[in-house]
Amino acid sequence: MASTTEVRVYPPDALPPKEAQLAWKIAEMATTPFAIDAEVDDMVANRIIDNAAVALAAINRAPVANARSQALAHPRAGGATVIGLPGDQMFECEWAAWANSAAVRELDFHDSFMAVEPGHPGDNIPPILAVAQQCGRTGRDLIRGIATAYEVQLSLAQAMALNTHRIDHVGHLAPSMTAGLGALLGLAPDIVYQAIGHALHVSTATRQCRKGTISSWKAVAPAHVGKCAIEAIDRAMRGETSPSPIYEGDYGVIATLLDGPEACYRVTLTDRGAPRRAILDTYTKEHSAGYHGQPIIDLAFKMRTRVDDLSKIESVDIFTKRFTHEVMGSGSNDPQKYDPDASRETLDHSAMYIFAVALEDGAWHHELSYDWDRRHRPETVALWRKIKTHEDPEWNRRYDDEPDPLKKAQGARVEITFADGSKLVDEQAVANSHPLGAVPFGRAEYVEKFRALVSGIASDFETARFLEAATGLGSLDSGGVMGLNPVADALVLERAARDQRGIF
């Protein structure tokens, strides 16, 4: 129930008709009604719970608090809610999406998907939820929008690599978010087609945001795209047009940013009206760190029980796939990944740091594991700087050549060499929380993650209220959808009132 289309660059005098363009095919698929099955219904609810958990856990971190203070400058009666703030406070949906997206992304703690282009498809949820609230949509409408967005992002992620051209993975979020909004609102294909052209045109960004000293922009990178997607849909609904063909044009995305004018991509899209189950091929995180590091943390937990004295470690070699080596490993050539003074955003993308701390502590915490004193321990720094990653052909093969997204080997083999020359060797293919892992996440694990992360931030009453709403997602009316962003305790929440620090 899927069809593959070849996407290539055409000269100006031989452009394909609109109906043959990838953006149109995405728009046409997105706007065709489809049946929602129970598994997808449940998983969308799980990801709403997951997003809310990690967002509340990050609620007072500076990038999140500042994004919230920007949203506070844009109130709107009948608008959308902001995570943490009381439900009777509403804001323009694009600004609510901005604030909520930043909160969801900040801790690098929500869902992921690994393909030729990795990504975090849970980033689609905040803008779609914000528009659903402002436009009075139901829980079923919301599920349709979110399931569609996941479908589009995964189709693109499996066909088009952005990272090899140093383009950030949020580039695939622009069409997926826009398609999801079109499905949510029941729009005509031409509106979504025009909006995809707009959103993609302004949302392709370089991967410098994930290189060297990683800045607080990482939290708002998807928020920016979500805001652009909402604005693109609004503009297209008013009859405006956008750059096209955005993929196939000789000055378009493929010709100028990706494989060039001779490129040909094969993109497989779910057929119109077919079930949209791509969300079931994605997975969340048990640990607050880049997804490439999830199995590495779990492997460190396992190996530490066989190490009597960490001070006797001479070296640690992590053999893994290219993505891990270049994005989180020593193959990035970023000295900041070995620097205890580096930003938190940098350290959660340092395989060397997270393996060292996990090996020492046997636990991982979204705050304590990155604490300033924790990262500056002399013994930690000494161990950390003994660790290197290596791109390994076998791990590349197990990742690149496996067609089933869930069966791709994402982990590593670790060799610990001791001062006496002896070695400890072990490997792990996927994280424990992965669908094929030792303890795959189900509804109970999502709920437990939520309860653990919001303890001391949301009241017991609010925790119960939110979980009841989220687990009943498919039956919610438009009023119930307004309750899908949890509220923080007023005594806990910072930046809860509009201020004059910026322009707004």
Predicted feature residues:
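Residue-level signal for well-ordered alpha-helical scaffold segments within enzymatic catalytic domains
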Residues: 127-130, 231, 256
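Terminal-appendage/accessory-domain detector
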Residues: 1-118, 217-227, 234-504
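Short amphipathic alpha-helical face segments that pack within enzyme cores
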Residues: 122-130, 172, 176-180, 291-298, ...
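Hydrophobic alpha-helical hairpins/lids featuring a short glycine-rich hinge
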Residues: 100-156
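Glycine-rich, mobile lid/loop segments that gate access to catalytic sites or pores
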Residues: 132-227, 231, 243-250
